[in-house]
């Protein structure tokens, strides 16, 4: 029951993932981080079986670091997405990973952020917005209506609010906590989005 979605703004990209780890109808933990920082300016959000996500994510992270040490430079976001897609394709008919990915990054040379959508069948596409799991099911229509090029951070925060509210409206047992991660020229930044705390704060504000 993963909720993962993301989009690009004005020289930054946002990736949101829920924090719940579930097995059938049991919640094992509510502080799971479903994103992995590949380097200082790239992150990858994954949905699928946890074993596949952890193993594949750490494999990509380690090999990108090895490339950096050997060659003295980091992969661009496009190159990182191509490498990740190639690894999914090579393993598809040998030992496939059931991993769906959103890969976001910022490239200083181009002075822009980008987002790549990949699925477990090794398709890869550069997108302005996308999602996996219930994030993909319920948020794409909101992206069609509210996403716009060069979004400001205030507009991006408002769009994140809309997407999470839609997920909570549609799902009977919707996650209450999300990691909101932004990647820009200064690196990656993480914020915990707690729906219960936000509702309590809204009630306090209305009471005043």
Positions of PLM-derived features:
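Long, low-complexity N-terminal extensions
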Residues: 1-208
């Amino acid at each position: 029951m993963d909720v993962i979605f993301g989009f690009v703004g004005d020289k930054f990209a946002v990736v949101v993932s829920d924090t719940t780890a579930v097995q059938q109808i049991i919640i094992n933990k509510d502080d799971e981080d479903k994103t992995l920082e590949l380097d200082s300016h790239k992150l990858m959000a994954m949905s699928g079986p946890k074993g596949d996500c952890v193993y594949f994510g750490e494999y990509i992270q380690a090999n990108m670091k090895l490339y950096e040490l050997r060659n003295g430079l980091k992969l661009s976001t496009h190159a990182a997405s191509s490498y990740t897609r190639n690894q999914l394709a090579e393993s598809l008919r040998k030992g496939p990973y059931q991993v769906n990915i959103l890969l976001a990054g910022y490239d200083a040379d181009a002075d822009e952020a980008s987002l790549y959508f990949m699925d477990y069948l090794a398709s890869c596409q550069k997108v302005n917005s996308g999602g996996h799991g219930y994030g993909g099911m319920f948020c794409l229509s909101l992206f069609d209506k509210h996403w716009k090029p060069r979004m400001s951070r205030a507009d991006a925060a408002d769009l994140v609010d809309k997407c999470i509210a839609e997920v909570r409206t549609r799902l009977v047992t919707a996650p209450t906590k999300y990691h909101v991660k932004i990647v820009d020229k200064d690196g990656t930044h993480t914020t915990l989005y707690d729906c219960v705390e936000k509702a309590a704060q809204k009630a306090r504000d209305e009471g005043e």
